[in-house]
């Protein structure tokens, strides 16, 4: 591998942004793009009331509801670093998509609302990060609103998320008294003027906390800041890069994404601290990013990114080697060679064809129904990357088609939307229904809305009478045949034609599991 190739890998930073809904994640994403020069004007994100919408919220239903329901992938440069930012769904109903995205990143940025502290979705996502030892940087947001004290927030993060906190910036006041941020790394005090839409550089900067001008500007807050900084320098956990990289320590920054407070300090520290692409596990061995042969895996599929063309894009994380336009790769699950002629990079729905890409980069491949989540592509070696999950749904609805003549379009729409993995479709063995299964109920509204706008299918849904699903398998063909015969009315095939048991309640599921000890009831499956 030549020096330039190695340099390209080392300057890449691929990360996901995670948070509870409404913590300000999409706004922070916008501001990172703004400071990175990828956009010149940030969309004012005001949920349902906004007349404009965030760059990363591109699907019609996202604009309508003011939430992110799909993962956007955005690339930009900052201080000679190549950044791949994955803005994940914040709404809890879309957690499965977020879990998968976390398999494609090298680190994560966790956003916490200063008033609400650690919330349930944050705890769930933290669990996923912990399973993968993902390094996490924390941004405590909305300091321009009244909230908890910084020390209380740090204590709550340590208690609830079981991770050591190291503050690298410190706020001056909060709410109406919020004046700016002290950079504990650079030993600089930044006083900011609010600026929602453009990169504001008009704030004052102080290198010396003993400067008398501070007392005139801040009054009692200047004294408090000096006391806080003295306490932090003596008592706070020192930053230890190894602890951070192992996921045991989180550097913490404070600010207000909406008003650009603390965003530049966060980005400056992030590119220096966050890890470049690292080795990835496969079934047979670990793959280093510095290997010469190309390899990568698909962690997401998105239908209709361009509704005019009804296209489907497979999002592929490059793990080793280098992509070059027109290269031939092996699609291992399908057992065939394919040519990748028009790979794209993204800024939300905007796409650009590229000539080359490196480990850490996320590229889009046109998918005509043959690529699935979890698929591995390599130049030669038959590898299979591991750890991309699919979860049993917890909510179920029966599809009602209002125009029976549209059944073909319904079938096509459901097939393509289920490829994305956010909703699952089950076809009962004993009926001709389509049963939708999802991790959260909002997904049903999204599916019906997308069927209407993207496929011209007017459909609705009704309760399906199921409370749990489990994929079933057995080492004995005879046992499986007997199980199928006795439980045919409760069995269905999923989108991958895998046999699934649908239970009306948890009690019934437990009873059947106890009755059939030689059947495995799987709550999660690895994609491919």
From Swiss-Prot:
GO terms for cellular component: cytosol. This is Peptide chain release factor 3. CDD domains: RF3, RF3_II, RF3_III. Keywords: Cytoplasm, GTP-binding, Nucleotide-binding, Protein biosynthesis. Signal peptide: none annotated. Residues 10-278 form the tr-type G domain. Disulfide bonds: none annotated. One of its GO terms (biological process) is regulation of translational termination. NCBIfam families: prfC (TIGR00503), PRK00741.1 (NF001964), small_GTP (TIGR00231). It comes from Syntrophobacter fumaroxidans (strain DSM 10017 / MPOB). Pfam families: EF-G_D2, GTP_EFTU, RF3_C. It is found in: Cytoplasm. InterPro entries: EF-G-like_DII, EFG_III/V, G_TR_CS, P-loop_NTPase, PrfC, RF3_C, RF3_dom_3_sf, RF3_GTP-bd. Increases the formation of ribosomal termination complexes and stimulates activities of RF-1 and RF-2. It binds guanine nucleotides and has strong preference for UGA stop codons. It may interact directly with the ribosome. The stimulation of RF-1 and RF-2 is significantly reduced by GTP and GDP, but not by GMP. One of its GO terms (molecular function) is GTPase activity.
């Amino acid at each position: 591998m030549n020096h330039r190739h190695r340099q390209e890998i080392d300057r890449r930073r691929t990360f996901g942004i995670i948070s509870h809904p409404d913590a300000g994640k999409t706004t922070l994403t916008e501001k990172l793009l703004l400071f990175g020069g990828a956009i010149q004007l940030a969309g004012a994100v005001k949920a349902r009331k906004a007349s404009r919408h965030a760059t990363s919220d591109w699907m019609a239903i996202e604009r309508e509801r003011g939430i992110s329901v799909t993962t956007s992938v955005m690339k930009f440069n900052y201080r000679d670093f190549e950044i791949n930012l994955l803005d994940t769904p914040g709404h809890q109903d879309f957690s499965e998509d977020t879990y998968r995205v976390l398999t494609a990143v090298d680190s994560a940025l966790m956003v916490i609302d200063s008033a609400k502290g650690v919330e349930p979705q944050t705890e769930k996502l933290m669990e996923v990060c912990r399973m993968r030892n993902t390094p996490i940087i924390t941004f405590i947001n909305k300091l321009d609103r009244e909230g908890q004290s910084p020390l209380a927030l740090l204590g709550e993060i340590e208690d609830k998320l079981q991770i050591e906190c190291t503050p690298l910036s410190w706020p001056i006041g909060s709410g109406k008294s919020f004046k700016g941020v002290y950079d504990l790394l650079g030993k600089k005090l930044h006083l900011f003027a609010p600026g929602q839409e453009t990169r504001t550089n008009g704030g004052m900067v102080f290198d010396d906390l003993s400067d008398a001008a501070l007392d005139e500007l801040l009054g009692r807050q200047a004294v408090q800041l000096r006391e806080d900084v003295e306490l932090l320098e003596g008592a706070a956990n020192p930053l230890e890069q190894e602890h951070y990289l192992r996921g045991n320590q989180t550097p913490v920054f404070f600010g207000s994404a909406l008003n650009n407070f603390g965003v530049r300090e966060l980005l400056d520290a992030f590119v220096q601290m966050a890890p470049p692409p690292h080795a990835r596990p496969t079934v047979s061995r670990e793959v280093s990013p510095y290997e010469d042969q190309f390899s990568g895996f698909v962690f997401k599929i998105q239908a209709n990114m361009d509704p005019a063309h009804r296209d489907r894009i497979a999002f592929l994380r490059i793990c080793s080697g280098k992509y070059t336009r027109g290269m031939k790769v092996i699609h291992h699950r399908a057992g065939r060679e394919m040519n990748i002629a028009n790979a794209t990079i993204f800024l939300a729905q905007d796409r650009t064809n590229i000539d080359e890409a490196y480990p850490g980069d996320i590229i889009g491949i046109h998918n005509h129904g043959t690529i699935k989540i979890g698929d591995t592509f390599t130049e030669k070696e038959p590898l299979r990357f591991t750890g991309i999950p699919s979860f049993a749904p917890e909510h179920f609805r029966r599809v009602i088609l209002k125009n029976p003549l549209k059944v073909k379009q319904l079938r096509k729409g459901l097939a393509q939307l289920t490829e994305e993995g956010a909703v699952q479709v089950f076809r009962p063995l004993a009926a001709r229904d389509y049963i939708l299964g999802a991790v959260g109920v909002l997904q049903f509204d999204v599916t019906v809305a997308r069927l209407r706008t993207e496929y011209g299918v007017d459909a609705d849904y009704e309760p399906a009478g199921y409370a749990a699903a489990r994929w079933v398998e057995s080492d004995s063909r005879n046992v499986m045949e007997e199980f199928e015969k006795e439980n045919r009315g409760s069995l269905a095939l999923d989108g991958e034609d895998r046999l699934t048991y649908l239970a009306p309640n948890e009690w019934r599921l437990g009873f059947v599991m106890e009755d059939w000890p030689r059947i495995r009831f799987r709550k999660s499956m690895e994609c491919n």
